[in-house]
Amino acid sequence: MGQTAMRVLVTDFMGEPDLEREVLPGVEVESLLMLVGHAPTPADLLRVVEERPAGALIAWHEMVFSASTLAALGRAGVRGIVRAGVGYDNVDLEAARAAGMTICNVPDYGTDEVADHAMALLLWCLRCLGGASPGAAWPQSWRDAGRFAAVRRLQGCALALLGFGRIGQAVAHRAQAFGFDVRWYDPYVPRGQDKVTRTTRVESLRDLLTGADALSIHCLLSEETRHLIDAQALALLPPHAVLVNTARGAVIDESALLAALRSGHLAAAALDVLSHEPPVGNALYDAYSRGELPSVLLTPHVAWYSQQSAVDLRRKAAAEAGRLLRGEPPWNPVTIRR
């Protein structure tokens, strides 16, 4: 490989890379979206990189990096990719390693925002706020307490966290202030973290779900976690349980979730993520849009966002790209879990 091109290309989602240029003086920073004038494809990316070599890429969530795309990028001299976000399920890590490329992410942004959003969704479910929305009988039904018969006291509720990284721990901290009894399952967290956080660690998914009043998902999407919450897992939750997901949609088998909601086995669900976004042809989304799921709340993958977190993410991603260009050790290289 020859000398690394001192150019950074933002591959998707973003327009003018003004903040990135501030972070990387002396480095040419371009937006693929601005260059091609439409939502970029992998073919657009490869064509532009061949014409205008880039040493590092900043990738958001819309571009998928397959084995063939990564091999071609490696041959074109791309040293590495920084995923502007926490998850990296749109990058084939094995193929990236084979191509000699370093993949990084930005795990230390937006933690508070996602944790706050998860708590808001959790409270929406447990306080039955879907039933509090004005309907055709409003205001005649103003004092109809039957709509709130399922509301449970938060103090002592068993909150199950699937995944106990930065965000999971931030949710635990917030939930404890409400009096939740927090338990969690994450085989990748070092031993003893339960003592530090004054929570309960369990050793299996079954132990996590059995008897839980609420399940909140905070794990990465991988082949190990894809559809981890399926019909069998949902059946372990008690009939009054609620589910919140601010991680990745495909961790849940959405057809099984829809069936559990329609049968009444689950009391409520609030999701910031779906398996495919935008959710074209998604049965769960379609039923929600038709008003068939009053105990469901969907938000459009915005848990990560605040004005401050958006700036934080872009600056940190750009700084990591700069380290890749200069051949310095990156701060957040992604490793392949075995």
Q: Where do the protein language model's features map onto the residues?
A:
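A short helix->loop->beta-strand "cap" motif at the edges of active sites that frequently abuts
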Residues: 75-79, 99-101, 180, 239-241, ...
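Gly/Ala-rich phosphate-binding loop of Rossmann-like dinucleotide-binding domains
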Residues: 172, 176, 261
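Rossmann-like dinucleotide-binding domain for NAD(H)/NADP(H)
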Residues: 240-338
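Phosphate-coordination loops involved in phosphoryl transfer and adenosine-cofactor binding
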Residues: 5, 78, 155-158, 240
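An N-terminal-biased, well-structured beta-alpha scaffold segment characteristic
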Residues: 2-104, 210, 230
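Glycine-rich Rossmann-fold phosphate-binding loop(s) that bind the pyrophosphate
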Residues: 164-165
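Phosphate-binding beta-alpha-beta segment of Rossmann-like dinucleotide-binding domains, i.e.
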Residues: 99-101, 107-158, 170-173, 192
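Rossmann-like adenosine-cofactor binding region
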Residues: 53, 65-69, 183, 187-284
